Amino acid sequence: MTNPLWGGRFTTSSNDIMKKINESISFDQALYEEDILTSIAHCKMLVNQKIISKYEGQLIIHGLEVIQKQIESGNFEFSTDLEDIHMNIEYSLKKMIGNIAGKLHTARSRNDQIATDLKLWIRKSIKKLEQQLHKLQSTLLNIAENHYDTIMPGFTHLQIAQPVTLGHHLMAYFEMLKRDRSRWQDLYKRMNQCPAGSAALAGTSFPIDRHFIAQELGFDSPTENSIDAVSDRDYIIEFLSNASICIMHLSRLAEEIILWCSYNFKFITLSDNITTGSSIMPQKKNPDAAELIRGKTGRIFSSLNHILIVMKGLPLAYSKDMQEDKEPLFDAERNLILCIEAMNSMLNNITINSENMLKAAEHDYSTATDLADWLVKHINLSFRESHEITGQIVKLAEHNKCKIHELTLIQLQKIIPSITEDVFSVLSAKNSVTSRTSYGGTAPINVLQAIKNGRIYLENTDSLTQ
């Protein structure tokens, strides 16, 4: 038996190997809702344009609604013999209402159908991601507000550099997620043109109304070029690029969580409900959620690479290679949402060990930059001169195995005679962070303002999650 939807010019059916490599229903059934929405909009347009009768349109739409209920209740049987979600639905519709079902495919192709389905699916996914990122940002704000003046070491090269506040550090991730969300919003606007009605690649001779379909499905407009419409997968590439940047941000935070809960840091304690144990070492409490976020980052990166390689050599318009766009897309979206949820759960169940953070912030001469700044302001040295002198003072402290503020004024004056006792006022971690009042700096007063701005941002973007 040849394929009932395209077998007219064939004398034999596909063999089992061809069916196996050709089918996509095992994964594109995830698009059933979008495919039915697209078909209903297309059917309404055909009725409006008098290409099919109103009665035929009613039969088709009712049948599609029944099929959707069957799928959602688990009573629909998908068949690999029918290749994909489009043909499974159309064949089921034909069994339900007869040959009238075949009229649904008038003036369209699976090429423009799948492109429309995918755009609808990505729009829905962007809203889900907006919801999850909004929640994660809210969690970061809450912790930052509780620890706007909690002092911790800031790092460069993973070496203690300068004291900062935990609130300021967490607000850095808030800003990263803001950029992530803006990328999703930009993608939504850029991709919101409707391919439906482009047919296989050249458009159609039927008097269709593409603007109606676009409006019915919530698009801003139809696509401008029918060849581009069916061969474009930029929106998938951009989605996966955005996903890669977003998971990279989560991976950086996950790495810090892994470090911070380790014995050598002890900055935080993770809750038992978001950690795991060891099958051999009874004492272990492992940050597996953070490690899995870090690990899944490579998986999402590879999804982006996958689709870029699929698309790089394809001539216009459609090629079957493009069937390979869906699995990496679905996998990346599913794992990114899971990672955002896991990160939110970790942060909501975290204990901050403030004393350990402060102790660490006071180590390794973290206020040396404050000393250099003081020499510039009060001794009228150039920064390069003060940098050299501060380096000598650090070397002296190392030699004496003490902190800078534990050196005596006499010891300091042997290096720079004009230094005064006032210098000790800038050598504490607390005074260091309090002094960093430049816009965007770590001073607690700045952090409170950043948190206030963050709350306004969340209020203004709440509608994007609806």
Curated annotation (Swiss-Prot):
It is found in: Cytoplasm. It comes from the Bacteria. This is Argininosuccinate lyase. The lineage of its organism: Bacteria, Pseudomonadati, Pseudomonadota, Alphaproteobacteria, Rickettsiales. Pfam families: ASL_C2 (PF14698), Lyase_1 (PF00206). Keywords: Amino-acid biosynthesis, Arginine biosynthesis, Cytoplasm, Lyase. It is an enzyme of class 4 (lyase). It comes from Ehrlichia ruminantium (strain Gardel). GO terms for biological process: arginine biosynthetic process via ornithine; L-arginine biosynthetic process.
